[in-house]
Amino acid sequence: MSRRGKVYLNARGKVEAGRRYTLSEALALVTDTARAKFDETVEAAVRLGVNPAHADQMVRGSVVLPNGLGKTVRVLVFAKGEKEKEALDAGADYAGSDEFIEKIKSGWLEFDRVIATPDMMGNVGKLGKILGPRGLMPNPKVGTVTFDVATAVKEVKAGKVEFRVEKAGIVHSPVGKVSFGPDRLMENIQALIEMIIKLKPATSKGTYIKGIALSSTMGPGVRVDPLDLRNL
C-alpha cells in the first residue's frame, strides 16, 4: 500500500462510520485528519430537500464568506469605457471587451471568475461553450452581471462564492483552508448555511437541509448532524 493510502486510511479510522457529529466536532476532525503537504481546501456538501428538476425548486446564489477562501482569485471583467476603469481601480486583474473575447476564443483561460456589464452580455454570450462548462459564465442571479463592477470585483476578491444545487439535490461549496482553524471555518460555514436557508424555495416541503458533510481535499468525509444547525 502506498504511503498516501496508509495516511488516508489512518485519517478515515478517526471518523466513526455512520456517526453524525456536531459542527464543531466535525470541523475539529476535518482539520485533524488533513495530512497533505499543502494547505488543503475544506468543502461543504449540503443535501437539500428539493427537486432541482423543477424550476421552482432550483437553489442558486452567492455569499461573501467573512474569512474569505484563503487564495488569490484572478478576476476578468468585460466592460468598456468608465466601467472598465472602475473595474481595474477596484482590483480586477483584467478588464476590457473584444480583445479578451478573442483571447479566450484562442484558448486563454488565466482567470478564475468573470464579471460583465449587462451591455457586454451579447458578445460574452458567444463564449458560452467555453465559459459555461467551466462555471465561469457571468449570471445576474449571482451578481456577476452588473453595472456596479467595483462592488462585484471587491466581493469576489474578498471571498465571494457561487453555488447551485446539483441534480442529486446537493450544494457543494468551498469554505476555506485547513489553516483557517475550526473557528474561522465555522464562521464561513455559518454564512453559507444562512444564505442557503434564505434561498429556500416556497415550494420545498418537509425537511429542507437533510444532511451536511465536510471534508478536506485529501481527507475523509465527516457527516454533520443537521439538528446541530439550529444553534447557528
Swiss-Prot record:
GO cellular component: cytosolic large ribosomal subunit
SUPFAM superfamilies: Ribosomal protein L1
GO molecular function: rRNA binding; structural constituent of ribosome; tRNA binding
Alphabetical UniProt keywords: Repressor, Ribonucleoprotein, Ribosomal protein, RNA-binding, rRNA-binding, Translation regulation, tRNA-binding
Keyword RNA-binding included in the entry's annotation: yes
GO BP of this protein: regulation of translation; translation
S-S pairs: none
Record-linked NCBIfam families: rplA_bact
Family: Belongs to the universal ribosomal protein uL1 family.
Cited HAMAP family: Ribosomal_uL1_B
Known function: Binds directly to 23S rRNA. The L1 stalk is quite mobile in the ribosome, and is involved in E site tRNA release. Protein L1 is also a translational repressor protein, it controls the translation of the L11 operon by binding to its mRNA.
Subunit relationships: Part of the 50S ribosomal subunit.
Name of protein: Large ribosomal subunit protein uL1
Gene giving rise to this polypeptide: rplA
